[in-house]
A protein has these predicted regions:
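Dynamic "connector" segments at or just before major functional cores
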Residues: 1-113
Length: 114
């Protein structure tokens, strides 16, 4: 399954009236930005502004890029265990498919210890 498929299992904590941006758009943006080095809400927003064309290859972002306060509010409202489970399930699936014992998300390799 793809990252998007795993992220789609996460429940949206918002009421319908407060859903200008799709949850899956926000989650995909946040994970992509953090995996690319973003360290805060403003970094995530900046990544989204700079990479909107790339992000739209995978998700519509029909209402454009959310502001950093929206990103923060929605991510903080998520069930952390549910998010963690979805993300780790995806990582483990990628790891198993690649035949690796572990995956370095920071781009570094680890030396095997004797």
């Amino acid at each position: 399954m793809s990252l998007l498929t795993h992220l789609a299992t996460i429940d949206d904590p918002r009421r319908d009236i407060n859903k200008k941006h799709e949850l899956l758009d926000l989650l995909f943006l946040t994970v992509s930005a953090v995996m690319s080095g973003a360290e805060g809400w403003k970094d995530i927003k900046q990544f989204g502004d700079e990479k909107l064309d790339w992000l739209r290859r995978y998700r519509p972002f029909a209402n454009g890029m959310p502001v950093d306060d929206t990103i923060a509010r929605v991510v903080r409202a998520l069930d952390p265990e549910q998010f963690n489970r979805a993300f780790l399930n995806w990582v483990n699936e990628v790891r198993a498919a690649s035949g690796q014992e572990q995956i370095a998300l920071d781009g570094k390799t680890s030396a095997k210890r004797p």
